[in-house]
């Protein structure tokens, strides 16, 4: 069949409007295994197909794109880079986005190949066209261009090609297209900056990082909201955090939060700014961040008390992130009654908010209450027990009630809360003394979907593997848990049937 494809390709090359042949070729190439096409790669004459893309015939273009998508998979990246450079270049300026997408997918293969990427780095015009693809209307085309340029920049030669040539001017020209395109270029710059301190140095020298930071701390609230997401991405790296601290950016963000009370439009950017500090606290030290920037935790508690679901959601997420580490738990515990009030609000929202916010509350509670076996000191166990009881008059029944609601996502999130505390003795005593709770855990008929069965199994596993459960639940219940565990999450109990003599 591969030979048939080669024959049809020759036929297509001879004709001016080979629609019938293209339809036949499309059927053949989809049917031929890729390894057979690779064996015939040297015989695949692809340039005529690229030429047919330029004839302004929609069906012909669609057929050629479909055929090329398949055939180019059989061609080595180095062959693409060396022998089809001009075709790739023309593909990037083609009016049809499907052709640009095809071309960029092949460039994506080339830049992943250490030998082939050199060919692209030596082709200034091709690089320029990739840069200009960032400015197009089609988002997937722009994203593919950003991805290729990010990959190119992983090497020293790539950094030099992008930042020490006319390409930097092209990048700055593309930014002038509109606000959306400018943010796409910032996205590229942050992607590159996040790789290493050397990459960040190239980006800062270009002036583009400084430009982004000026927009972040400028007066336009919508621009702030967009820029903080990118700056947060940079802060995920150690060298990025160091740079932001040295440049005074973290202090500036803190000051903007301080001034947010007098800004009627702060709702646009506050969630992003608070998330920034939440991520910072987790990646560095919750205690250091909260001590150095007290306004951060102050604002989180204030947002938890808000009537705005967006603000509440961010506060809940941030508390969950902070409380995922022992150090973060200690920081929250030190705030005393302030945090108890937050826990009451979380419990209230878990019961009364929208489904999406309920799930976020439950996820936060799971993070806050979880302790690994080595963390289960008397102090920490006393703390998680106190936190649990602060959420409601009867927190166990609160979460059990949520788990009984007919929404799998809520059911799983509530089971995760029980799993988080399942190996803590105080929680086991609560579960055992709560009427019907042990039966609820053992009852397989409650869960109907895979995710719920998996979540219940994780709860059973956490209980069964606990050192204290046999003593607290009793041996018979412990053996039932072990049996559930050995049967697996999807076990179905056989139903006994009685044969009746004479029945059909």
UniProtKB/Swiss-Prot annotation:
N-acetylalanine PTM sites in chain numbering: 2
Coiled-coil residue spans: none
Q: Which GO terms describe its cellular component?
A: proteasome accessory complex; proteasome regulatory particle, base subcomplex
In terms of InterPro entries, this protein maps to: ARM-like, ARM-type_fold, PSMD5
Q: Which GO terms describe its biological process?
A: proteasome regulatory particle assembly
Pfam families found in the cross-reference section: Proteasom_PSMB
The reply to whether Hydrolase figures as a keyword in the UniProt entry is: no
What superkingdom does the record give? Eukaryota
Keyword flag Acetylation: yes
Keyword entries, A-Z:
Acetylation, Chaperone
User: Would you identify the family this protein belongs to, as annotated?
Assistant: Belongs to the proteasome subunit S5B/HSM3 family.
What's the entry's take on its domains? Rich in dileucine repeats, which have been implicated in trafficking of a variety of transmembrane proteins.
Which function does this protein serve?
A: Acts as a chaperone during the assembly of the 26S proteasome, specifically of the base subcomplex of the PA700/19S regulatory complex (RC). In the initial step of the base subcomplex assembly is part of an intermediate PSMD5:PSMC2:PSMC1:PSMD2 module which probably assembles with a PSMD10:PSMC4:PSMC5:PAAF1 module followed by dissociation of PSMD5.
Q: How does it associate, per the subunit comment?
A: Interacts with PSMC1, PSMC2, PSMD1 and PSMD6. Part of transient complex containing PSMD5, PSMC2, PSMC1 and PSMD2 formed during the assembly of the 26S proteasome.
Protein name in UniProt: 26S proteasome non-ATPase regulatory subunit 5
The coding gene here is Psmd5
């Amino acid at each position: 069949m591969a030979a048939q494809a080669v024959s049809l390709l020759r036929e297509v090359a001879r004709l001016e409007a080979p629609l019938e042949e293209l339809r036949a070729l499309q059927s053949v190439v989809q049917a031929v295994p890729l390894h057979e096409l690779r064996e015939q790669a040297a015989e695949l004459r692809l340039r005529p197909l690229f030429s047919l893309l330029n004839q302004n015939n929609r069906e012909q273009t669609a057929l050629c794109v479909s055929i090329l998508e398949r055939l180019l998979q059989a061609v080595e990246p180095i062959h693409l880079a060396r022998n089809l450079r001009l075709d790739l270049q023309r593909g990037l300026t083609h009016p049809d986005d499907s052709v640009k997408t095809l071309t960029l997918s092949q460039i994506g293969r080339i830049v992943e190949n250490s030998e082939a990427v050199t060919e692209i780095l030596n082709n200034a015009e091709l690089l320029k066209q990739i840069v200009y693809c960032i400015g197009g209307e089609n988002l997937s085309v722009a994203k593919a261009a950003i991805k290729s340029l990010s990959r190119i920049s992983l090497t020293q030669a790539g950094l030099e090609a992008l930042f020490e040539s006319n390409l930097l001017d092209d990048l700055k020209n593309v930014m002038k297209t509109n606000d959306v395109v400018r943010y796409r270029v910032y996205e590229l710059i942050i992607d590159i900056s996040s790789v290493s301190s050397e990459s960040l140095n190239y980006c800062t020298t270009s002036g583009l990082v400084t430009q982004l930071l000026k927009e972040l701390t400028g007066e336009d609230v919508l621009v702030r909201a967009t820029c903080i997401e990118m700056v947060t991405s940079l802060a995920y790296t150690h060298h990025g955090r160091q740079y932001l601290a040295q440049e005074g950016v973290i202090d500036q963000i803190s000051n903007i939060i301080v001034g947010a009370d007098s800004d009627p439009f702060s709702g646009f950017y506050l969630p992003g700014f608070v998330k920034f500090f939440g991520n910072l606290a987790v990646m560095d030290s919750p205690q250091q961040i909260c001590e150095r920037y007290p306004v951060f935790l102050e604002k989180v508690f204030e947002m938890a008390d808000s009537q705005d679901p967006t603000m509440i959601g961010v506060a809940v997420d941030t508390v969950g992130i902070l409380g995922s580490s022992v150090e973060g738990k200690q920081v929250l515990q030190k705030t005393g009654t302030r945090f108890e009030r937050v826990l009451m609000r979380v419990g209230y929202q878990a019961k009364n908010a929208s489904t999406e916010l309920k799930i976020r509350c439950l996820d936060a509670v799971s993070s806050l209450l979880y302790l690994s076996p080595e963390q289960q000191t008397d102090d920490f166990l006393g703390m998680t027990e106190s936190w649990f009881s602060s959420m409601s008059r009867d927190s166990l029944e609160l979460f059990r009630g949520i788990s009984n609601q007919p929404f799998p996502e809520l059911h799983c999130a509530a089971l995760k809360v029980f799993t988080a505390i399942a190996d803590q003795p105080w929680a086991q005593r609560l579960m055992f003394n709560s009427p019907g709770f042990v039966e609820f855990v053992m009852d397989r008929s409650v869960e109907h979907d895979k995710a719920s069965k998996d979540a219940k199994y994780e709860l059973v596993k956490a209980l069964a593997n606990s050192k204290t459960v046999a003593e607290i639940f009793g041996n018979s219940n412990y053996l039932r848990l072990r049996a559930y565990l050995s049967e697996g999450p999807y076990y179905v109990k056989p139903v006994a049937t009685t044969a009746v003599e004479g029945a059909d």
